[in-house]
C-alpha cells in the first residue's frame, strides 16, 4: 500500500470580480489488488481551505475508485466522487501512454454531466499537465500544472 500527501495552491480569477488564492492539502492511499487491478482512495482539501473576501469554502471531496490495466500502455478508471456539498458523482476514464514520456487522458462524469481531455509530458523528474474540461452549463475550462516526482 502506498500513502501520499500533496499540497495544492489554487488561484481563482474572475473578470470584473478580482482574484484570490488558497493552499489545499490532499491525502491519498493506493493498493495493488492484482497485477491488473489497483484500488485507491483520496481526501482532497482535508484542511478545509477557503477563498475570497467572503471566505467561501473550497470543495472537500472523498474519492474511491478502481484502475484496471488490460495492457501496459492502457488504464481504464472507475471512480466514485463525493463532494460534501453535492450528490455522488460517478466518473469513468482512460489513460493511454503511447510513450514513456507522454500520457493521453479522456473521461466523462455524470454529476453534473461533463467530459475532459488531457495530456501529461514527463521530462526527467518534471511533469507538465494540461486538461480541457467541457461542462454543459459552465462552458470550457483549461487547467495546467507542473509537478515534481
Predicted feature locations:
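Outer-membrane beta-barrel porins/channels
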Residues: 1-149
Amino acid at each position: 500500500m502506498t500513502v501520499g500527501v500533496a499540497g495544492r495552491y489554487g488561484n481563482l480569477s474572475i473578470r470584473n470580480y478580482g482574484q484570490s488564492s488558497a493552499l489545499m492539502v490532499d491525502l491519498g492511499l493506493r493498493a495493488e489488488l492484482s497485477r491488473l487491478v489497483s484500488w485507491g482512495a483520496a481526501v482532497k482539501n482535508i484542511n478545509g481551505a477557503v477563498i475570497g473576501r467572503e471566505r467561501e469554502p473550497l470543495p472537500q471531496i472523498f474519492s474511491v475508485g478502481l484502475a484496471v490495466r488490460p495492457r501496459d500502455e492502457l488504464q481504464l478508471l472507475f471512480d466514485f466522487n463525493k463532494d460534501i456539498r453535492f450528490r455522488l458523482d460517478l466518473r469513468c476514464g482512460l489513460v493511454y501512454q503511447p510513450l514513456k514520456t507522454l500520457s493521453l487522458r479522456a473521461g466523462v462524469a455524470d454529476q453534473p454531466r461533463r467530459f475532459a481531455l488531457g495530456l501529461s509530458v514527463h521530462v526527467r523528474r518534471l511533469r507538465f499537465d494540461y486538461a480541457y474540461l467541457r461542462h454543459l452549463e459552465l462552458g470550457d475550462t483549461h487547467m495546467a500544472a507542473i509537478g515534481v516526482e
